[in-house]
Amino acid sequence: MNLMMHDVRYQNMTLKNADTLEMDWPDGVDEHGVDHPHSFDMVVANPPYSARWDNNDNKLKDPRFKEYGALAPKTKADYAFLLHGLYHLKQDGTMAIVLPHGVLFRGAKEAQIRKALLEKNQIDAIIGLPANLFYSTGIPTVVLVLKKNKESKDVLFIDASKNFEKGKNQNVLRKEDIDKIIDTYKERKDVDKYAHLASFDEIKENDFNLNIPRYVDTFEPEPEVDLRQVSKELHDVNAQIRDNEQELVGMLKQLTSKDDEVMEGINDIIKNLEGEIK
């Protein structure tokens, strides 16, 4: 349905309902145990985030995963989906996958896979998106752009998390937001508070942690406070409060009641207010 909504003719579709990670259709090993993967010029994926999967040790023999030395955790299949798509990417192709930010910095096995991807020079860019873009989740997500045949070992970081239009139920990337991401990706240059081209050595110094704030500084300094102006405003506010209290006392003194208890209460309020005014 998603393909049809984006004007892909059904004659150009090949659909299969199966467990992607369990059955690498239409591929598989031949009678000699050799795998013949079907490769694509482009791979685009938005898999279920942090899904569970069967990461038994036999998966380490799977050609999709074995070159990375570790398997994605049982309760977080994010890197399993990533490696599946990357395996089917042509040598000169480009892959883009949407995942939660956790894949950028989580440790243990995921850190091992992330390090291997960087050492193999397969991560091309990391693009942080705004929160609440998708119907299924409100969490902020990230686009990882991957290639198998990069010319340089740097990685472009883009923080596009603040560039969006707030809708009634979800946020929307405007045309200018998308154009800015694309132009920045093509230019591969630093943009103040938006993008940074990090060298492999810089990433290595950060222990292969790809958390975007480590590379793109979006900090906005607080404006300087004019203490004299603040003091004057505070004095003016206090003066206004005193005027209002005096006006209230005058109004209360005009009140009368045959009920002695009510009048006693009013007089107590007047006494307290006059004490504060002094």
Task: Describe every region a protein language model picked out.
Residues 10-20:
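Conserved SAM-binding strand-loop segment of SAM-dependent methyltransferases
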Residues 20-23, 27-278:
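A conserved structural/catalytic subdomain of Rossmann-like adenosyl-cofactor enzymes
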